[in-house]
Curated annotation (Swiss-Prot):
Binds 1 [4Fe-4S] cluster. Its cofactor is corrinoid; [4Fe-4S] cluster. Keywords: 4Fe-4S, Cobalt, Iron, Iron-sulfur, Metal-binding, Methyltransferase, Transferase. InterPro entries: 4Fe-4S_dom (IPR007202), Ac-CoA_synth_d_su_TIM-brl (IPR016041), ACDS_complex_subunit (IPR051069), AcylCoA_decarb/synth_gsu (IPR016218), AcylCoA_decarb/synth_gsu_arc (IPR023427), Dihydropteroate_synth-like_sf (IPR011005). NCBIfam families: PRK04165.1 (NF003195). Signal peptide: none annotated. Part of a complex that catalyzes the reversible cleavage of acetyl-CoA, allowing autotrophic growth from CO(2). It catalyses: 5,6,7,8-tetrahydrosarcinapterin + methyl-Co(III)-[corrinoid Fe-S protein] = 5-methyltetrahydrosarcinapterin + Co(I)-[corrinoid Fe-S protein] + H(+). Pfam families: CdhD (PF03599), FeS (PF04060). This is Acetyl-CoA decarbonylase/synthase complex subunit gamma. Disulfide bonds: none annotated. Heterodimer of delta and gamma chains. The ACDS complex is made up of alpha, epsilon, beta, gamma and delta chains with a probable stoichiometry of (alpha(2)epsilon(2))(4)-beta(8)-(gamma(1)delta(1))(8). One of its GO terms (biological process) is acetyl-CoA catabolic process.
Length: 458
């Protein structure tokens, strides 16, 4: 059952002291539910009441952190099965494989590429999250050398080996950066648990295709003092992808719907395994990206990839960005006037809405077309042109208010405004309420540069 603000309020001091910077304890309770504040913000909380609140507010899937303190990765924290029920928290961590037997220069170059890979979409920089250092050499010494080399990068690391001695050697040089340890299984459970507790590092539990065994091993790990666990039920690709999806879904259902403490942990998938049966590199990249997208849509909190080609990574990062936006909050930019190029009193004025995807699409088209113009961004509550037109947010009075608030009228000589083609039905109303001449522009912002060239030649 979902926790309400009243459930939280009953356990708060109810003094309305304001030390949390909220007007009342009820307001603080509401923000706790929305995860906008933390229990640490209430100085009067202590003892049993705080513990009760921690238990009450604990998400269905426990949050796990790994990586250096100033560059930590947080995974888990979800409370629902379906995004529309609330939202998803803590985007899937995308981790890239780095074998320890690469020549030292190549090892560092690949690590640097992983760290620096990024692209911008709708104003947000999308990047990879961590390196998976894999003990491909089978040598504890080689594993430790590679761990020491990448420790200087101060970047989150997943240490991948079933060999306890190799894990020990790597932790001696990297343990203070809280790497994620991969992995414990039945034959090394006790030793890996001891390392996890000793170094304070989270531990992956590997039990391929057997959820009953996973449940038993998870319980044993917790009895040994391991509190931060990640579950890997195995990534079977090809004809086995259906079994993989079933296992991921069952684990998350057991956590969210049944509250099964043995499964209330983040899930790891390894799309890199899809490469094992493919010889063609391009086909391998495509298959890996497909598996990554599939598992991300089915509750994967951490994914280990092998490819670093930007054309493979881009769709996975784009899917993650879309999946982890909050459906309760429209994605919007600040309304107002934005300048492109060296504007003056003769520069055209273009109208658009403050829906993020709309704004950044228009921005990209104006920049790529080397357009000099004023861009008026109307507050449509984060809705696109056609949606805001239908919903009544894009209207004459709203545009008139925007003109007044921005002072754009004093910055241009001619009162001429270009509106999106989809906003044509509102052109007359905008003209009447603003007193400006309204021109209906192209339906797609990619046509703006040619449209302006045509206007200038008339």
């Amino acid at each position: 059952m979902q926790v309400t603000a009243m459930d939280v309020y009953r356990l708060l001091p109810k003094t309305n002291c304001g030390k949390c910077n909220e007007a009342s304890c009820m307001a603080f309770a509401t923000k706790l539910i929305e995860k906008e504040v933390t229990l640490d913000d209430c100085p009067q909380l202590s003892g049993d009441e705080r513990q009760k609140l921690e238990n009450l507010l604990a998400p269905a899937v426990k949050e796990i952190t790994f990586g250096p303190e100033e560059n930590q990765v947080v995974v888990g924290g979800d409370e629902v099965l379906y995004r529309y029920e609330l939202t998803y928290y803590n985007p899937t961590a995308l981790v890239v494989d780095l074998p320890d037997d690469l020549p030292s220069e190549e090892l560092l170059n690949r690590a640097q590429r992983i760290m620096e890979l990024e692209f911008e979409r709708t104003g947000e920089k999308l990047t990879l999250d961590a390196i998976a250092l894999r003990n491909r050499s089978g040598s504890p010494e080689k594993f430790a050398e590679a761990a020491e080399a990448i420790s200087k990068l101060n970047f989150p690391v997943v240490l991948c080996t079933f060999d306890v001695e190799a894990m020990k050697a790597a932790l001696e040089v990297l343990g203070d950066q809280k790497p994620l340890l991969y992995a414990a299984r039945e034959d090394n459970l006790g030793e890996m648990a001891e390392l996890s507790v000793s170094y304070g590092c989270p531990l992956v539990l590997f039990s391929p295709g057997d959820l009953e065994e996973m449940k038993n091993l998870s319980r044993r790990l917790r009895s040994l003092g391991v509190t931060e666990i990640v579950l890997d039920p195995g990534t079977f690709t090809g004809e086995g992808i259906g079994d993989t999806i079933d296992n991921f879904v069952m684990i998350r259902r057991l956590a969210v719907e049944d509250g099964d403490d043995d499964f209330r942990f983040p899930i790891m998938g390894i799309p890199a395994l899809s490469r094992l049966t493919v010889s063609d590199k391009i086909e391998a990249n495509i298959r890996e990206a497909t598996v990554a997208a599939t598992l991300m849509n089915r509750y994967a909190d951490i994914l280990i990839l092998a490819g670093t080609e930007i054309w493979e990574i881009m769709p996975v990062l784009t899917l993650r960005q879309g999946l982890y936006t909050d459906p309760r909050k429209p994605q919007a930019v600040d309304p107002g006037v934005y300048e492109f190029g060296d504007v003056d009193e003769n520069s055209p004025v273009i109208l658009t809405t403050n829906f993020s995807l709309t704004y950044y699409t228009v921005e990209g088209d104006l920049k790529s077309g080397d357009v000099t113009a004023y861009l008026l961004v109307l507050d449509t509550e984060g809705r696109a042109v056609d949606v805001s037109l239908a919903g009544g947010q894009l209207n004459g009075p709203a545009v008139a208010d925007l003109i007044k608030e921005t002072g754009i009228e004093e910055r241009v000589r001619d009162k001429v405004m270009i509106i999106p083609g989809l906003a044509a039905p509102a052109s007359g109303e905008i003209e009447d309420d603003t007193g400006w001449r309204v021109l209906v522009g192209p339906r797609d912002s990619s046509g703006i540069p040619d449209y302006l060239d045509k206007l200038a030649s008339e």
